[in-house]
Curated annotation (Swiss-Prot):
GO terms for molecular function: ATP binding; GMP synthase activity. InterPro entries: Class_I_gatase-like (IPR029062), GATASE (IPR017926), GMP_synth_C (IPR001674), GMP_synth_GATase (IPR004739), GMP_synthase (IPR022955), GMPS_ATP_PPase_dom (IPR025777), Rossmann-like_a/b/a_fold (IPR014729). This is GMP synthase [glutamine-hydrolyzing]. It comes from Agrobacterium fabrum (strain C58 / ATCC 33970) (Agrobacterium tumefaciens (strain C58)). The gene is guaA. The lineage of its organism: Bacteria, Pseudomonadati, Pseudomonadota, Alphaproteobacteria, Hyphomicrobiales. The active site is at C86, H176, E178.
Length: 525
């Protein structure tokens, strides 16, 4: 496992808040390394990480309930600065002798706090005697502060909206500074890590690149590494970073399942072979995948079929590479990101409903008995893009919209055929071309065309047509967890629809999807 030591870091103890990852994002944006660990293993994480400061997250539990989560005593014994947020405020105060009660007026949504006393927590942007908007989400509240604490700010239903023991560097907020609805929340978190904890902004992708190259060389030695290349940003950045570290000890395998966008496979193969000179095995498996998918209309069966075939094809190619006389690869590279790591050790540890199966190479390590090389496992998606820029990847590649592993198979509801895929590729290319011409590509999180399993009557010239319906989808989002449809003007939609109908044989009607997530998902399948 490829990991870096971080002497100057922040530990975030997760008590189950749905927005804990946003705390980490804000801290990273401030140039400071941090890790999230669930409260169940926080003591072990604290001892291992040796952080310079700790943040207690919010959470759904009530501090007044028997057996509700607590922070490890070792954190208090260490005397490092602490910031408690919402539930984090309540458990910190409870554990230090304060009182928390339920049944008072709750606050959910926007609230205004009144600053009663100056504090380094908001030095430079909030002033004593003034009010500022924040985002609250609490039912319980602190009714008695621990010894040594004083009120810094209040709100209508939170007498201790901010409370602190500045001598011990303990700070608490009843509101959530990590969410965008608290306009100055990012500055507050930055002040905590810089002015209170005293850390510098030394978490950069340049430093990460140099240290990760050293760690990869240390882990791999003279061994060979295989990388399953999808053509997406994550696996591409991982491959280029590993190649920079160990050169031709890396071999990439690109399995072309025949479900990519127009010209995409050629672009990926050309970039890796010609521009980066990375050893690449290009497997044209379109006939295999499309043959197995013939007549399959259930989206879950599609996803699982694609995942199974990918593993089978990759294993076969790995066996060929192992027999080339240069030694069998002992390492498997994956583009695992930090959110994947967090979710694998979730706060609750309980089951969750599977909305859609995720197509990835998760089944490969156990089956192939290989050690993992995961150079991105400490990074969020935006940091991966920043690392890609640091490595010199073109912006046109780094800024590409997300594309699902099963490819166009899930943008073609119902049974797929080569003819349908060709129609969809052309429509999708025209749609994205119009988006780029309008200067909207970087504004939109994700945009794509969907070919519906529905045919409608149309008229072209003097002839009746009976062709497919194409749906256009475009959403704005921060992280893909929630999304809103993009509000195009009608002139744009008219241009895109006209081009698609005129230039793509097989489509005679175009519609626009105005569903947000939730209740819908971004992809149609």
């Amino acid at each position: 496992m490829t990991q870096i030591a971080h002497p100057d870091s922040i530990l975030i103890i997760d008590f189950g808040s749905q927005v804990t990852q946003l705390i980490a994002r804000r801290i990273r944006e401030a140039g400071v390394y941090c890790e999230i660990h669930p409260f169940q293993n926080a003591a072990e994480a604290f001892e291992k990480l040796q952080p310079k400061g700790v943040i207690f997250s919010g959470g759904p539990a009530s501090v007044t309930a028997e057996g509700s989560p607590r922070a490890p005593q070792a954190v208090f014994d260490s005397k490092v600065p602490i910031l408690g947020i919402c539930y984090g405020q309540q458990t910190l105060c409870t554990q230090l002798g304060g009182v928390v009660e339920g049944g008072h007026a709750a606050e959910f949504g926007r609230a205004d706090i009144d600053i009663k006393k100056a504090s380094p927590l908001f030095e430079g942007f909030w002033e004593q005697g003034k009010s500022y908007p924040v985002w609250m989400s609490h039912g319980d509240r602190v009714t008695k502060l621990p010894e040594g604490f004083e009120v810094i700010a209040t709100s209508e239903n939170a007498p201790f909206a901010i409370a602190a023991d500045e001598k011990r560097h303990y700070y608490t907020t009843m509101f959530h500074p990590e969410v965008v609805h608290t306009p100055d929340g990012g500055k507050l978190l930055s002040n905590f890590v810089h002015k209170i904890v005293g850390l510098k902004s030394d978490w950069t992708m340049a430093a990460y690149r140099a240290e990760m190259i050293r760690k990869i060389r240390e882990q791999v030695g003279t061994g060979r590494v295989l990388c399953a290349l999808s053509g997406g940003v994550d696996s591409s950045v991982a491959a280029i970073l590993i190649h920079e570290a160990i050169g031709d000890q890396l071999t990439c395998v690109y399995v072309d399942h025949g479900l990519m966008r127009l010209g995409e496979s050629e672009q990926v193969v050309g970039m890796f072979r010609d521009h980066y000179n990375i050893p690449l095995v290009h497997v044209d498996a379109a006939d295999l995948f499309l043959g197995e998918l013939s007549g399959v209309s259930d989206p879950e069966v599609k996803r699982k079929t694609i995942g199974r075939l990918f593993i089978e094809v990759f294993e076969a190619e790995a066996a060929k590479i192992a027999a080339d006389g240069k030694g069998a690869p002992k390492f498997l590279a994956q583009g695992t990101l930090y959110p994947d790591v967090i979710e694998s050790v979730s706060f609750s540890g309980g089951p969750s409903v599977t909305i859609k199966s995720h197509h990835n190479v998760g089944g490969l390590p156990e089956r192939m008995n290989m050690q993992l090389v995961e150079p991105l496992r400490e990074l969020f998606k935006d940091e991966v893009r920043a690392l890609g820029r640091e490595l010199g990847l073109p912006e046109s590649f780094i800024g590409r919209h997300p594309f699902p592993g099963p490819g166009l198979a899930i943008r073609c509801p119902g049974a797929i055929t080569r003819e349908k895929l060709d129609i969809l590729r052309k429509a999708d290319a025209i749609y994205l071309d119009e988006i780029r011409k309008a200067g909207l590509y970087d504004t939109i999180w994700q945009a794509f065309a969907v070919l519906l399993p529905v045919q409608t009557v149309g008229v072209m010239g003097d002839y009746r047509t009976y062709d497919f319906v194409c749906a256009l989808r475009a959403v704005t989002s921060v992280d893909g967890m929630t999304a809103d449809f993009y509000p195009y003007d009608m002139n744009f939609l008219g241009r895109a629809a006209t081009r698609i109908i005129n230039e793509v044989r097989g489509i005679n009607r175009v519609v626009y999807d105005v569903t947000s997530k939730p209740p819908g998902t971004i992809e149609w399948e």
